[in-house]
Structure formats: structure tokens, C-alpha cells
């Protein structure tokens, strides 16, 4: 089942991951410069606002909205929905700075992603994905973006940036959200 969709984002990395996860779909970046501000209290609210923004410009295509972040136990679940604005391109470095001296469970973390798809007729589908793990003591690895150089997934001993983009495309919170989105679509 393939659909033609616009992703209400300017993030090429997210586009690449979603093209892989939503195999058979044709997805393009909306590429607008005037996205609505992320003012939602939840990932869903932000993803839905982006999808609605995209829908107004998508014509007869589906509109995809995505919001994601990392929740770190030692930061009381932060930065959470504020992840994109929390460190302005220095996510991994800031996480290490904020967690200096924090050990054990305080370094537990989870990536969270919410995807919302709105069809041309206005039907909404959504999928949520999470990836549990912990924040490393130092940055390692060259692939990925954001928190990937410091995020070690459960069951692994290397960061997402070390595991690489191929691993991430199949196992990330975004890939899991895409699979959940496909289930939602198939069940409707």
C-alpha cells in the first residue's frame, strides 16, 4: 500500500528515515519556512499541528506531521517535547553537561516519536514509537543526529551514532512510530 504524502518538516534526516520505514510511499518534504511554532504540551499535539499545516498545502496528497524528543529520568523527563529547542544543535553536548555527576537510573532515557497522517478527505491516523535506553558518559559515533552520539539503546553497548543509520532506520523510535501508523491505517 503506497501513498503520496508531504512531510511537514525541513529535516532531511527524518525524511530519509520515514521513506525507509514507510516503504512504498512517495514522501516529499513540504519545505515551507513558516511552520507553526511547536506550542503543544504533547508530541501528539505538535505532530497534529504540523500535519494540519501540511494538509492545507498538500492538495490531494496525504500530510504527515512528526514530533519527537528524548525524555531523560535524571532531568525529570526533560527535555521531552522541548527537545528540538532545548539545545539548538548541541543536544548531545548539553545532555552530557546536564547529567554530569549523575549515575545509574538518572541516566535512563527514552526516545519518543509521534506520527500523524491526515488523508486528503481529513481522516486522521497516528502512530507512537519509543526506544528505551540510557545516556552514555561520553559522545561516540559519527552517524545520526541530535542525541544519537550519547543514546545507548536497551540491549546494546554502543550509541545509536555508532550502531549507524542502517540500524537506526530499522529500530528507532521513528521506525516504530511508522510501523504503528501503518497498523492504524490497515485497521481503518
Place the predicted regions along the sequence by residue.
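Anionic-ligand binding patches
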Residues: 2-6, 12-188
Amino acid at each position: 500500500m503506497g501513498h503520496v504524502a508531504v512531510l511537514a518538516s525541513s529535516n532531511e534526516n527524518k525524511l530519509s528515515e520515514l521513506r525507509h520505514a514507510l516503504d512504498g510511499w512517495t514522501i516529499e518534504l513540504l519545505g515551507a519556512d513558516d511552520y507553526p511554532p511547536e506550542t503543544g504540551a504533547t508530541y501528539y499535539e505538535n505532530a497534529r499541528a504540523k500535519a494540519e499545516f501540511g494538509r492545507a498545502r498538500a492538495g490531494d496528497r496525504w500530510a504527515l506531521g512528526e514530533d519527537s524528543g528524548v525524555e531523560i529520568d535524571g532531568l525529570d523527563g526533560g527535555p521531552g517535547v522541548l527537545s528540538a529547542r532545548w539545545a539548538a544543535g548541541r543536544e548531545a553536548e548539553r545532555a552530557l553537561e546536564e547529567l554530569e555527576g549523575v549515575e545509574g537510573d538518572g541516566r535512563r532515557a527514552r526516545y519518543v516519536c509521534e506520527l500523524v497522517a491526515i488523508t486528503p478527505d481529513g481522516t486522521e491516523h497516528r502512530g507512537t514509537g519509543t526506544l528505551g535506553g540510557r545516556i552514555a558518559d561520553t559522545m561516540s559515533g559519527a552517524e545520526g543526529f541530535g542525541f544519537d552520539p550519547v543514546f545507548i539503546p536497551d540491549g546494546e553497548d554502543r550509541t545509536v551514532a555508532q550502531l549507524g543509520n542502517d540500524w537506526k532506520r530499522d529500530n528507532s523510535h521513528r521506525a516504530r512510530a511508522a510501523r504503528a501508523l501503518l497498523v492504524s491505517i490497515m485497521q481503518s
